[in-house]
Regions:
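Short amphipathic alpha-helical segments embedded in low-complexity Lys/Glu-rich regions
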Residues: 340-347, 370, 393-403, 438, ...
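Alpha-helical bundle/repeat cores within regulatory domains of eukaryotic proteins
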Residues: 396-397, 409-486
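Short, contiguous acidic and Ser/Thr-rich linear segments
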Residues: 564-581
C-alpha cells in the first residue's frame, strides 16, 4: 500500500510554531524597537537604492529639480515606473521645503497633486497677466520641449553610479541651449547635458520602447502531466504549472550576469516592484533592523559576517560554509527519513551539537558522522530563525508576505521574482540552496511523508517569524503570527517555481542595455562638448559607430577562447546559429572529453578543447558581462549588441 503525505491542514504550521516558542530560552533575546522613520527618510532610502543618489544630493542641498530634468533621468523607464520615481522626488522636495521654516513656498500653501506634478523653481513664475506659467508635467515624457528653460542653480553632482561629478553652470548667456539630464547606468563616468528633443528621439530609437504591459515573466501555463511526479510535486498544492517561454536572446539566470550588471538590475527591480504594489493598492513597510548580532561564531551571526569570514578561507564561497554543510548532510542522509523537518530531535543532543559547532567547526574538527537526521534538521531551522537579520531581510520580509494579496498568479510570480532580485547576494544564494533542499525532500514524499504543503507549512514560521515575534512585546508577536499564518503559500511557490524565480526578466535587461547605450553616447559627446555652440550639431548626437562594421554587415563574429588551443576564430552567423553552436566549433568532435592528449598538427603538446561546461559570454558593448543560454540566437543578439566581445570560458578552468 502506497503511503501518502499528511493532509493539507495548518496542523503542521501551528505545531512548528509551538516548537519554536518552546525552544526559545529568551536569555539572549534582544528587543527590537521599530523606530518611526524621520520625515523624508523613507524617500531618501528608496531613491538611493533605486540608483538616484545624485537626486537626493541635489534636493537635500536645497535645490529644485524641474519637470524637464525629472523626465530626463526617467527617460528609460516605463510610464508607471517614471511616475513612481516622480512621486518620491516630489515628496522629498516638499519635505525639504517644509523644513526650511525661514522660507515659505507657495507650493506648500497650495500643494500640487503628487501624481502628475513636480517641483518647479523656488519663485513661482507668472506671465504679465498673472496667469501661471505652463505646467511642465503636461509635456509627454521623452518628448520635452527644448525651448523650456532649465533652472539649474549653483553646483549639482550627477552620477547614477556615484563615481563621477560634473559641474553645471547656470545657462544665463543668450544663445546657449538648456538641456536636461538622463539617468545613468553602470558604465557612467560623467554626466553631460542631453541633446535637443529631435536628437533625443533619434537616439531613443536604438532600442524598442518599453510599455507597462511588457514588464512580465515569459512563462506559459501547462496542463498537468505525469512528469509532475518526477519533479516531486503533486496536484495537492493547487498551484498551476508554468514553463519558461524560450527567448530568442536567451533566458538569463541571476548567476549569468556580472555583479555590476546585477546592481543595475536591482535598481530597476525596486522601481518596478514599487509600481506593481501601488497598482495593486498594496502597502508594505521597509523596516530596518536594529539588532546587530554577534561578530563571530555560528548561530546568531549575520549572513554577511559569516560569508566575509568564509571567503577568507574559500574566496569563491557564495553561501555560509556551515549552512552548506548542513544542507549537504541532509541531502545525503536525511531525505528518506519519515517526518523529516516535522519531527523534532532530542533537545539535549541538539544543545550539545550547537556547542560543538561553535567550538569546532572553523578549526575543522567537527564531525557529522554521528549526527542524527532529525537533529540535523532542527539545527538547520534554528540557524535560519536565529539570524539577527532574516533570510528574506527586514526590508522585504513584509513584501514577501503581501504577495498573497495579489490575485493573479503570474503577477504573484513576477513580484516574487523582483523580490528575489532585490535580496543581497548571500541571502539569495542561501535561499536558493535551502529551496533546492526542500524540493528534494518533497521528491521523496512517498517515503518521508513530507509533501509540498507539509514542508511549506513547517518552514513558513522559520522564515517569516523574526526574533522580535518571540520577544515580550505581545502586540508585535500577535501581528507577526497573523502575518506568518498566511505565508505557507508563499513558501510553496518559492519551492515549486524556484527555477522561474531565479531568472532575470528580459525587459529589465533591455532597459539596462538602453541606459548603457545612452551612457556611451554621453561619453562620446563629452569629448566634444564645445560643439554644442555650433549651429550644426548632428555629428555630436550620432549613434556610437560599430567597431567592426565589415564583420557586422557580413554577420561575422570574432570569438575568443584564451584557455583553448584554438584561441580565436571568426564565426559566420546564420539565422539559426545559437550560442551552443558557436561553442561546439571549439570542441573536439573525435573525443567526448574536452581536454585530451591528442597531438595537433599545428600546435605542439597537449591540445585543449572546450569542455562540456564551456559557455559563451557576451562581454561589453551595451552590457557588462552575461553568460549566454546555449539556445540564444546569435544573429539577433549580435544585431542588438554589435560592439560586444564573445568569449568562451569553462567553469572548471576558472
Amino acid at each position: 500500500m502506497i503511503r501518502t503525505p499528511r493532509s493539507n491542514s495548518y496542523e503542521d504550521y501551528w505545531k512548528e510554531f509551538k516548537d519554536i516558542a518552546s525552544s526559545t530560552d529568551g536569555e539572549n533575546e534582544e528587543e527590537e524597537i521599530t523606530k518611526t522613520p524621520d520625515e523624508g527618510e523613507e524617500e531618501i532610502s528608496w531613491l538611493k537604492e533605486a540608483g538616484y543618489d545624485f537626486v537626493v544630493n541635489y534636493i537635500t542641498g536645497g535645490r529644485e529639480l524641474t519637470d524637464e530634468e525629472i523626465q530626463g533621468f526617467t527617460a528609460t523607464l516605463t510610464t508607471s515606473q517614471a511616475a513612481v520615481v516622480r512621486r518620491r522626488v516630489n515628496t522629498l522636495s516638499a519635505t525639504i521645503r517644509s523644513k526650511q521654516k525661514h522660507k515659505v513656498d507657495v507650493r506648500d500653501i497650495f500643494p500640487q497633486p503628487p501624481d502628475n506634478q513636480s517641483p518647479r523653481s523656488p519663485v513661482p513664475q507668472t506671465t504679465s497677466d498673472g496667469i501661471d506659467d505652463i505646467n511642465l508635467s503636461a509635456v509627454p515624457r521623452r518628448h520635452t520641449d527644448k525651448r523650456l528653460p532649465s533652472l539649474y542653480r549653483g553646483r549639482g553632482e550627477y552620477s547614477m553610479s556615484g563615481r563621477g561629478n560634473e559641474v553645471f553652470k547656470d545657462p544665463e548667456e543668450s544663445g546657449i541651449e538648456t538641456l536636461s539630464v538622463q539617468q545613468t547606468g553602470t558604465f557612467n563616468k560623467h554626466m553631460v547635458p542631453d541633446p535637443p528633443d529631435d536628437m533625443r528621439r533619434s537616439v531613443m530609437t536604438a532600442m524598442p520602447s518599453i510599455s507597462d504591459e511588457d514588464i512580465e515573466l515569459c512563462i506559459e501555463e501547462t496542463a498537468p502531466k505525469n512528469s509532475m511526479q518526477n519533479a516531486g510535486l503533486e496536484k495537492e498544492d493547487n498551484l498551476p504549472n508554468f514553463n519558461i517561454v524560450p527567448d530568442r536572446l536567451g533566458v538569463t539566470m541571476v548567476t549569468d550576469l556580472s555583479l555590476e550588471d546585477m546592481k543595475q538590475i536591482k535598481s530597476l527591480a525596486l522601481i518596478e516592484l514599487t509600481a506593481l504594489f501601488e497598482r495593486h493598492h498594496i502597502i508594505y513597510h521597509r523596516r530596518k533592523g536594529k539588532k546587530k548580532g554577534r561578530d563571530h561564531g555560528i548561530f546568531g551571526v549575520p549572513l554577511h559576517t559569516l560569508i566575509e569570514q568564509d571567503q577568507k578561507i574559500r574566496p569563491n564561497q557564495t553561501v555560509p560554509m556551515v549552512f552548506e554543510d548542513m544542507a549537504k548532510f541532509m541531502e545525503h542522509h536525511c531525505l528518506e527519513q519519515e517526518g523529516i523537518l516535522r519531527i523534532p530531535g532530542s533537545a539535549s543532543r541538539i544543545k550539545q551539537l550547537r556547542k560543538d559547532l561553535e567550538d569546532k567547526f572553523y578549526s575543522g574538527t567537527f564531525s557529522w558522522v554521528n549526527v542524527l537526521p532529525h537533529d540535523a534538521a532542527a539545527l538547520l531551522k534554528q540557524f535560519l530563525r536565529e539570524l539577527p537579520h532574516p533570510l528574506l531581510t527586514h526590508e522585504y520580509i513584509e513584501a514577501f508576505a503581501q504577495v498573497e494579496n495579489i490575485q493573479d498568479k503570474k503577477q504573484q510570480l513576477l513580484v516574487l521574482n523582483l523580490l528575489i532580485l532585490l535580496l543581497p547576494p548571500v541571502n539569495r544564494n542561501t535561499l536558493k540552496m535551502l529551496l533546492e533542499l526542500l524540493l528534494k525532500i518533497t521528491q521523496k514524499r512517498r517515503t518521508n511523508l513530507m509533501g509540498l504543503s507539509n514542508v511549506s507549512m513547517i518552514m513558513a514560521p522559520n522564515l517569516f517569524l523574526s526574533p522580535s515575534s518571540r520577544s515580550k512585546t505581545k502586540g508585535v508577536r500577535e501581528m507577526e503570527i497573523s502575518m506568518a499564518a498566511g505565508t505557507s503559500n508563499i513558501v510553496m511557490m518559492l519551492i515549486k517555481y524556484q527555477d522561474i524565480l531565479w531568472t532575470v526578466p528580459s525587459v529589465l535587461i533591455q532597459q539596462m542595455r538602453h541606459q548603457n547605450e545612452l551612457e556611451m553616447q554621453k561619453k562620446n559627446r563629452e569629448k566634444s562638448i564645445m560643439k554644442f555652440l555650433r549651429k550644426d550639431k548632428a555629428d555630436v548626437y550620432k549613434k556610437p559607430a560599430v567597431i567592426n562594421e565589415g564583420d557586422f554587415e557580413e554577420g561575422v563574429i570574432r570569438v575568443l577562447a584564451p584557455s583553448l588551443t584554438k584561441s580565436c576564430a571568426a564565426v559566420k552567423l546564420t539565422d539559426n546559429t545559437t550560442a551552443g553552436d558557436v561553442v561546439d566549433k571549439f570542441r573536439n568532435t573525435n573525443f567526448t572529453n574536452g581536454r585530451n592528449k591528442k597531438k595537433d598538427n599545428n600546435v605542439q603538446g597537449v591540445a585543449n578543447f572546450a569542455e562540456k561546461d564551456a559557455r559563451l559570454y557576451e562581454v561589453g558593448g551595451n552590457i557588462g558581462e552575461r553568460r549566454l543560454d546555449p539556445a540564444t540566437n546569435m544573429l539577433a543578439l549580435y544585431q542588438l549588441n554589435p560592439n560586444a566581445e564573445w568569449v568562451i570560458r569553462s567553469e572548471s578552468m576558472d
